[in-house]
Amino acid sequence: MTSATIPGLDTAPTKHQGLLAWVQEVAELTQPDRVVFADGSDEEYERLCAHLVEAGTFQKLNPEKQPNSYLALSDPSDVARVESRTFICTEREIDAGPTNNWMDPAEMRGIMTDLYRGSMRGRTLYVVPFCMGPLDAEDPKLGVEITDSEYVVVSMRTMTRMGRAALDKLGDDGFFVKALHSIGAPLEPGQKDVPWPCNDTKYITHFPETREIWSFGSGYGGNALLGKKCYSLRIASAMAHDEGWLAEHMLILKLISPENKAYFIAAAFPSACGKTNLAMLQPTIEGWRAETVGDDIAWMRFGKDGRLYATNPEFGFFGVAPGTNWSSNPNAMKTIAAGNTVFTNVAKTDDGDVWWEGLEGDPQHLIDWKGNDWTPESGEKAAHPNSRYCTPISQCPTLAPEWDDPQGVPISAILFGGRRKTTVPLITEARDWQHGVFIGATLGSEQTAAAEGKVGTVRRDPMAMLPFLGYNVGDYFAHWINVGKNADESKLPKVFFVNWFRRGDDGRFLWPGFGENSRVLKWAVERIEHKADGKSTPIGIVPTAADLDLEGLDVDPADVDEALAVKPEEWRAELPLIEEWFEFVGEKLPTGLKDEFDALKHRLSEEG
């Protein structure tokens, strides 16, 4: 078909010539049966969900258990982000840096153009306009995703401000990030579709300099919902570097003291380290309350008053299901219970509800994530470890009224944290901004199921951004340092380093975590207010057990002491690992971080 004969191309609801030319170019290349501009309406959502049920992609769940909610089971080969197939294609290889896969942009465009040729035959090409962050922001960040996946269209409606309003905001000549996605599964006439079409060949490619994303072969989450990690972190981090702001893999939490004073906290943890749990914290200490601004991504820029303000660019939660339950995260469960959720790769109960490992209940029979019968004797997990729920943020019972404020919220503290059995104390305060950047830059965490790789080994994950950097990691560290240098130091957030996951010699968790983490945050807030003590150690300022509010907490004081312990011999063992990491970062490592490393070595040597 030529573009003139592809239905829908001639009835586009926009006069934006750049957008129309791009849609026409992609349609001519990919050869869809029709072109549809998504409007983001309820009616469209219901129509697409009904289509997905008919196609076998969605199963409608019991409306009494999960109102207006669906279950999708993916192809077993398409279950997580594929870091090995994720590329940053800058003109110069050094600008992508050592943490990213790189290919020459012209070569990559050639390879992927061949893959896209005819890839949407037999399918519909959807044009999905969206905005990351509030539509009424001073500088709204707009994007358009072209996709042949209805699963993507309905998920983008939940995860972003998608549809007619975003298209109107774009106007006739506004800038937008081009995000092209195809599952790579063309249908010949009469060919029967499969419930989860995808392609064995996968590419998730970013062109930071031209602000473009090309994704092929995967229908799963972060590979296909291109507003999420691809735009909000990889492309946005490059934009932020050029424009003087920060795009970070961080939750945003509002903590309210008994005196009704609000503190906004941003926290960077690698995937599956409790970001969503902390974002929806239920404090266990009397008089303290918490509200949610975001659970995954924070865009931070300086306000007119010199403080750092953060916005959550997302519109929904795309959370890991396993481990989420009524005790670990009751607010996530309430958000899900309100309905309007798409579950992916969880198990299904006999009465049309969902189940996953860690959820209350003791089911004797399920249909597992592969569509097979499951019983407790099956010997494998019923839900995939990276199974997900995709749910509107507006349903969260702890949602802060400021979540949608185009100005953002002023950040008082930044936390970095990972999953470490040893070495790293429950909380450490950085000495200053540059020391805080060093802490973030050397963050280590044990591998999780959210990405490919061996589970349990410690990998460096700087600022929890290792898989999400859109440019050279050394330039990124320098950007963080410069953000601090260019600011009024008295107005910068304090930086803390947390580890909820430290274990004793017998393998037990030393700290109960979850809602009890409010006690740790209380100490951080009191440090901001100069009301709490801490002990200077080689790695920073660490509280003693007496400095924490442990009232009403049933925990052995010796365990708290152990959770807070700074053991010089463990840190000396950490030094060569940090050195190895900095060598990997290479020539662009800022001297400020080398200075911090030398200072840490010196302080540890003085400990004897």
From Swiss-Prot:
Query: Where do the catalytic residues lie?
Result: 273
Enzyme Commission number(s) from the entry: 4.1.1.32
- Look up keyword Metal-binding and say if it applies: yes
Residues holding GTP: 272-277, 388, 419, 514-517
| GO annotations of cellular component type | cytosol
User: Which residues of the sequence carry a binding annotation for substrate?
Assistant: 81, 220-222, 271, 386-388
Indicate whether Isomerase appears among the record's keywords. no
Q: Which GO terms describe its biological process?
A: cellular response to glucose stimulus; gluconeogenesis; glycerol biosynthetic process from pyruvate; oxaloacetate metabolic process; propionate catabolic process; response to lipid; response to starvation
Cross-referenced PROSITE patterns, in alphabetical order?
Answer: PEPCK_GTP
Write down the superkingdom of origin: Bacteria
Q: Which GO terms describe its molecular function?
A: GTP binding; manganese ion binding; phosphoenolpyruvate carboxykinase (GTP) activity
EC main group? lyase
Keywords recorded for this protein, A-Z? Cytoplasm, Decarboxylase, Gluconeogenesis, GTP-binding, Isopeptide bond, Lyase, Manganese, Metal-binding, Nucleotide-binding, Ubl conjugation
Pathway(s) this gene product operates in, as recorded in its UniProt entry: Carbohydrate biosynthesis; gluconeogenesis
State the needed cofactors, names only.
Mn(2+)
Q: Which Gene3D superfamilies match?
A: 3.90.228.20, Phosphoenolpyruvate Carboxykinase, domain 1 (3.40.449.10), Phosphoenolpyruvate Carboxykinase, domain 2 (2.170.8.10)
**Subcellular compartments:** Cytoplasm
Catalytic activity entry: oxaloacetate + GTP = phosphoenolpyruvate + GDP + CO2
Principal localization reads cytoplasm
The record's similarity note reads:
Belongs to the phosphoenolpyruvate carboxykinase [GTP] family.
- What PANTHER family would the database entry show? PHOSPHOENOLPYRUVATE CARBOXYKINASE, PHOSPHOENOLPYRUVATE CARBOXYKINASE [GTP]-RELATED
HAMAP family for the chain: PEPCK_GTP
From the Swiss-Prot or TrEMBL record, give the protein name: Phosphoenolpyruvate carboxykinase [GTP]
Annotated organism of origin? Mycolicibacterium smegmatis (strain ATCC 700084 / mc(2)155) (Mycobacterium smegmatis)
